[in-house]
């Protein structure tokens, strides 16, 4: 049995690596890749998503371009994209699949409505999914689960309070968390438990072929962006690829129920995910939250998924 998923993302090198994992994993059936504005403008994320899908060899997977910006707030500019290889800077030398004519939110809604209940894996802002739910409220009952990389129970990674993916569109995140859909949240604090190690990069390189070389290039480029923080991990977290891996196998993570709400009004805390593990609010839990990862198993699962794409 494979789990049907839609991968909504903002590629980005980390998202591109997650696309490779989602396409190659034996337990996943990747039905669509949808992109939108996030770390890069919407046209660049769509192009990068199309490149990543072409590299997998799975040209049957539709790739759509979506949200040009957030639902309400002005679009943020990441300001941290100092990658020196892979998809940043722009790579016109790499093959790309043709983009689907539909908007990402339309493609999400149509794929969900047409088939068995799908899991939505998100590794970027939640704008496309929120728009799909606004377009077609009926699809909420047909989404099996949302597995999303975003938020934090501690410090933010963009402001003192907020993590990037949620801060890019807090109103969209609030719509998703309030839609009554089962959610697995992978906060950056929890995702930090699986890092990009020299052995992981070597393992990708050892796979060989264009896919293995591309995966290794993506991993190396991500390491160049790492800036150690006072309380953060001592290595670059793997981040986005963890989302499809946990969707396929939740036993890779330690997961606990919690109440998750998104701050929409605070002067200093706008975009913060308020994760109530102890039930202090009196509100029912609305998410399963990843608080730890088995790094060795995550690494093996990632390499196994990419190995299935190597010709």
Where are these predicted regions, by residue range?
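Conformational coupling and interaction surfaces
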Residues: 2, 18-22, 29-30, 167, ...
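Metal-dependent C-N hydrolase catalytic cores
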Residues: 2, 46-115, 119, 284-293, ...
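Active-site histidine-anchored catalytic micro-motif
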Residues: 2-51, 92-193, 198
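Short, charge-rich amphipathic segments
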Residues: 37-45, 66-67, 100-113, 224-246
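A residue-level signal for conserved active-site and pocket-lining positions in enzyme catalytic cores
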Residues: 63, 176, 244
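Short, surface-exposed amphipathic charged segments that create phosphate/polyanion-binding patches used
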Residues: 76-83, 160-163, 201
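Short clusters of hydrophobic/aromatic residues that line enzyme substrate/ligand-binding pockets
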Residues: 87, 164, 262
């Amino acid at each position: 049995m494979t789990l049907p998923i839609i991968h909504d993302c903002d590629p980005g090198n980390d998202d591109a690596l997650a696309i490779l994992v989602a396409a190659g994993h034996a337990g996943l059936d990747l039905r669509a890749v949808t992109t939108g504005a996030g770390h890069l403008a919407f046209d660049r994320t769509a192009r990068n998503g199309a490149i990543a899908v072409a590299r997998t060899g799975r040209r049957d997977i539709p790739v759509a371009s979506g949200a040009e910006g957030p639902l309400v707030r002005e679009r943020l500019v990441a300001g941290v994209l100092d990658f020196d290889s892979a998809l940043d800077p722009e790579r016109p030398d790499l093959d790309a699949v043709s983009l689907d004519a539909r908007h990402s939110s339309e493609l999400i809604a149509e794929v969900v409505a047409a088939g068995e209940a799908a899991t939505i894996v998100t590794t970027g802002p939640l704008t496309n999914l929120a728009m799909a739910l606004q377009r077609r409220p009926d699809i909420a009952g047909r989404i099996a689960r949302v597995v999303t990389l975003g938020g934090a129970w501690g410090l933010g990674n963009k402001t003192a309070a907020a993590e990037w993916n949620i801060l890019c569109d807090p109103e969209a995140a609030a719509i998703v968390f309030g839609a009554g859909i089962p959610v697995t949240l992978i906060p950056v604090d929890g995702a930090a438990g699986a890092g990009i190690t020299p052995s992981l990069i070597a393992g990708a390189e050892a796979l060989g072929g264009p896919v293995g070389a591309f995966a290794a290039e993506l991993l190396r480029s991500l390491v160049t962006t790492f800036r150690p923080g006072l309380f953060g991990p001592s290595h670059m977290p793997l981040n986005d690829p963890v989302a499809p891996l946990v969707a396929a196998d939740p036993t890779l993570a330690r997961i606990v129920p919690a109440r998750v709400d998104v701050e929409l009004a605070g002067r200093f805390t706008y975009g913060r995910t308020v994760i109530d593990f102890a039930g202090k609010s009196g509100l029912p839990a609305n998410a399963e939250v990843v608080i730890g990862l088995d790094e060795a198993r995550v690494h093996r699962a990632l390499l196994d998924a990419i190995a299935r794409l190597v010709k």
